[in-house]
């Protein structure tokens, strides 16, 4: 694979001196490609749709948020890739959340607020509910072997019906977590392959899970400096916490990783609610 990456980069005028695998990229294979004093990200996406979606949103957000610059895209052995600029800084995992400064946390809130201020391309208010129902239906069909499957599915479907059209329709990242934020001279956002429009509350979930109350209030303060906090946030986060845990099990199932720590972590979230 690395030899082919070298060949592709060379065709685009970049002489490679070193390639390192990115270790915290879960839904794609990413490499840091070094060329003398420059660095690039060579990212192989899960499928063509995700490649095109990420390329589209990188171009959309380039002059709005701090994001990498898309350089070129292509196909490698029936796998689809994007090449973008490397962002200098540090990315931390959830377990290192206590290393964040108050300024870091506030800036994360500002970053999310700026993203949610971007005009959505899909004005269809029903598309988010359709996405939720389709995600739940697919998960339900694939998780017949999970003892809580029926109970969780019925609960979530009922919640979706109750929340119809009662949300702030914004552009969502869908995986707004610490691992997709780079802390450097500025705060950068990465990983745009799953973006779509929908309920703004969903993007608060990953930070809600790991920040303590004081830190989450600071995060909200940063967000509120850009735009209003969505109504009924805590109530909706309870729903999305279960929805995300349930559909994450299906993510693991599709990638044959049901023995992973990530799978077990999400099973425990469901068990706390339904057992």
Each predicted region: which residue ranges?
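An alpha-helical support segment within catalytic cores of ATP-dependent transferases
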Residues: 1-14, 106, 117-174, 265-274
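Structured beta->alpha junctions
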Residues: 23, 46, 74, 193-196, ...
């Amino acid at each position: 694979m690395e030899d082919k990456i070298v060949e592709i980069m060379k065709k685009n005028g970049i002489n490679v001196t070193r390639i390192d695998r990115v270790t915290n990229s879960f839904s794609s294979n990413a490499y840091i490609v070094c060329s003398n004093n420059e660095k690039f990200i060579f990212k192989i996406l899960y499928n063509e749709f995700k490649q095109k979606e990420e390329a589209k949103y990188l171009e959309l957000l380039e002059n709005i948020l701090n994001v990498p610059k898309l350089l070129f895209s292509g196909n490698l052995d029936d796998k689809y890739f994007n090449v973008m600029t490397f962002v200098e800084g540090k990315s931390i995992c959830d377990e290192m959340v206590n290393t964040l400064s108050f300024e870091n946390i506030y800036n994360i809130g500002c970053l999310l607020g700026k993203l949610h201020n971007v005009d959505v391309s899909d004005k269809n208010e029903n598309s988010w509910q359709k996405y939720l129902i389709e995600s739940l239906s697919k998960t339900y069909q694939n998780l017949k072997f999970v003892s809580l499957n029926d109970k969780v599915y019925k609960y979530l479907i009922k919640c979706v019906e109750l929340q119809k059209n009662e949300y702030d329709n914004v552009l969502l990242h869908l995986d707004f977590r610490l691992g997709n934020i780079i802390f450097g001279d500025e705060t950068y956002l990465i990983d745009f392959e799953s973006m779509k429009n929908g309920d703004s509350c969903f993007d608060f979930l990953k930070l809600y899970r790991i920040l303590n109350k004081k830190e989450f209030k600071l995060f909200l303060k940063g967000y509120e400096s850009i735009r209003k906090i969505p109504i009924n946030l805590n109530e909706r986060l309870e729903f999305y916490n279960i929805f995300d845990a349930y559909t994450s099990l299906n993510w693991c199932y599709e990638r044959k990783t049901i023995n992973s720590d990530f799978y077990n972590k999400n099973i425990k979230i469901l068990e706390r609610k339904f057992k």
